[in-house]
Amino acid sequence: AGCQGLDLAQAPVAAVQLSGVWTVDEEASDDLRAFTRPPSERRRPKLSVQEEIRRIGLGSGLAFVVQDFQIIDAQQIVIEQDRDSMGVKHIPGTYRDVTWGDRERDIWRVQAGWQEMDLVIFSTAKGLRILERYQLVNPNRLRLDLEVQADGVNRKLTRFFDRKRRAGR
């Protein structure tokens, strides 16, 4: 999937309200263990002993992605959406701020914006590509599709979150 130069808009085609407290639906979501499992030996290029030692020493790109993209294993997220940005508190985890447009964040080049009604965040670094798509299935159900390219392997993960109803509603 050639995602270079994603055509992302500064606003969705119609109002999309992502703000709120969202709790993961484990049953409906993909299994994280399958996502983080090393690729089967036959799919991974054969490495010499030295290369294998170096790979282990460097740590896997996927492990780095899981650490840096806490949406992958957050149990709950709190989203504060503005016109041109979004803040996401990951529980457990840290706070992440995303501004629409093109930005550099640490080692990442981040493109964020809208495709129709979906919020898309595309992050690239050396040998790593992460595509996140936030999609409201209905006003109280959020689907998150992740495509991760790391360690020469493509992985996909889909997670579902339900909006927490405010007390007394």
Predicted segments, located by residue:
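PEST-like low-complexity, intrinsically disordered acidic/proline/serine-rich tracts
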Residues: Q4-R169
